[in-house]
Amino acid sequence: MAVGIFDSGLGGLTVLDAVTKALPDVPLIYMGDNAHTPYGVREADDIYDLTTAGVQHLFDRGCDLVILACNTASAAALRRMQEGWVPEGKRVLGVFVPLIEALTERQWGDNSPPREVDVKEVALFATPTTVSSRAFQRELAFRAIGVDVEAQPCGGVVDAIEDGDMILAEALVRSHVDALKRRMPNPQAAILGCTHYPLVEDVFRAALGDGVAVFSQPSLVADSLGDYLKRRPEMLGSGEPAFLTTGDPKSVEAKATIFLRRKITFEAVG
């Protein structure tokens, strides 16, 4: 039995690591589309095609439930997938919902009208495609009113992390935070809207300064998955744990080992 985790590259390993710690008895199959990363500058149709292909690999491996641990895929492809592609008996979940639950302190099953929440000014850091989709703002509007969201497209950060150039990644983060703070000097909360960003979370926190509540996805997604599986234990599929990639396994293994600080063996898929 296994739950699938899909990402455009290595960022989803932050989610996998959090899920492994929170739910050690849940086997996981990870699928990284490293051959086509990053998704953050691609067109929506391209992202949809790549995401469905990646998720299909996980379905073929016996997963009934797949987490899109990629905000760009969640923003650009998830709704379309859920409306017309996901087979009966399968589920694909995104990573926005746990964030919004935490930010608004409202459970997703709470279908009462949107209401005012304590947080009024929110900084959103995400890929260019996620920002342009306005998916986060759209989902937030179902739950809260009176929240000003200032979004910063963080071009180059994912590329630098995937290339292992953390010095460049950290410099880009500081630049993007400075750019946002010129438009919103004192955000109450900051959303790290990409699963790569926890790898540079300390840089975001330092650049934002004290007093800003930073919401990072891995632990929120892990907790949400735990709650979901308590309600739907039948969604644990029949697959065996594995790490899959569309890229070069040896290259991906080397970078993934640095991220997780443990040896991982990847298997190539077409």
UniProtKB/Swiss-Prot annotation:
Annotated pathway: Cell wall biogenesis; peptidoglycan biosynthesis
Gene3D superfamilies linked to this entry: 3.40.50.1860
Catalytic residues identified in the record: 70, 194
Molecular function terms from GO: glutamate racemase activity
Entry keywords, A to Z: Cell shape, Cell wall biogenesis/degradation, Isomerase, Peptidoglycan synthesis
InterPro entries xref list: Asp/Glu/hydantoin_racemase, Asp/Glu_race, Asp/Glu_racemase_AS_1, Glu_race
Enzyme kind, highest EC tier: isomerase
GO aspect biological process, one term: peptidoglycan biosynthetic process
Keyword Isomerase part of the UniProt annotation: yes
EC number(s) stated in the UniProt entry for this protein: 5.1.1.3
Pfam assignment, any one: Asp_Glu_race
Top-rank taxon: Bacteria
Ligand binding (substrate): 7-8, 39-40, 71-72, 195-196
Catalytic activity: L-glutamate = D-glutamate
HAMAP family tied to this protein: Glu_racemase
Family: Belongs to the aspartate/glutamate racemases family.
Record's function text: Provides the (R)-glutamate required for cell wall biosynthesis.
Identification of the protein by name: Glutamate racemase
